[in-house]
Amino acid sequence: MAPKSDNTEAIVLNFVNEQNKPLNTQNAADALQKFNLKKTAVQKALDSLADAGKITFKEYGKQKIYIARQDQFEIPNSEELAQMKEDNAKLQEQLQEKKKTISDVESEIKSLQSNLTLEEIQEKDAKLRKEVKEMEEKLVKLREGITLVRPEDKKAVEDMYADKINQWRKRKRMFRDIWDTVTENSPKDVKELKEELGIEYDEDVGLSFQAYADLIQHGKKRPRGQ
């Protein structure tokens, strides 16, 4: 049920004064729907209030713009305005501090959410304990001199190593043959030519072919189980 006309005017007047800004009929009608007021009733109340001098209005073509009477409001002086600006600045500063606090709390929450749960920590602890136990068992076997490498794996590595040594020996011999031929027919000093071409012998870089080749023989002489 719609309010009576006098109640409607009171509602509309209170709304216009609270808003204290230019309003048209549609603005007021949309905002006052919660009071079950129709647009026609709002229009009638606005016109009645304007005729009574309780609000003011201006006409722009066919549209009327209504606004609260400004003489009913206390206008602050320059000192009061300055105080209001100062208070507003303090409030803005407090607002920024609150926003920062909220942001810090949200970051802390995200950080806590990204951490492991108790259940995950327990699972990780159990996994690490298992890995440590396995490593300790391997260490005990090593100390006891037990071979941890399978014989077939050991032989495969030794065969591959021997093949690489043979390739090294062949390439070393090929280089020597080619190098001897080049230096014999070159008028330049061997050392000078070597530096000019950027050639380095194994010995120049701290390598000893024989030392690596001897490892094969040493490996064959080692007793089993070591």
UniProtKB/Swiss-Prot annotation:
Q: Coiled coil where?
A: 76-150
Describe the task this protein carries out.
Involved in bivalent formation and segregation of homologous chromosomes in meiosis.
Q: Which GO terms describe its biological process?
A: chiasma assembly
Its gene is HOP2
Gene source species: Arabidopsis thaliana (Mouse-ear cress)
Protein name per the record: Homologous-pairing protein 2 homolog
Keyword Nuclease, does the record have it? no
Q: Which UniProt keywords apply?
A: Coiled coil, DNA recombination, Meiosis, Nucleus
Q: Which family does it belong to?
A: Belongs to the HOP2 family.
Effect of loss of the gene: Sterility due to failure of both male and female gametophyte development.
What PANTHER family is this protein classified in? HOMOLOGOUS-PAIRING PROTEIN 2 HOMOLOG, TBP-1 INTERACTING PROTEIN
The taxonomic lineage of its organism, from the top, reads: Eukaryota, Viridiplantae, Streptophyta, Embryophyta, Tracheophyta
Q: How does it assemble?
A: Interacts with MND1 and MIP1.
The tissues where this chain's protein is expressed are given as:
Expressed in vegetative and reproductive tissues. Found in seedlings, leaves and flowers.
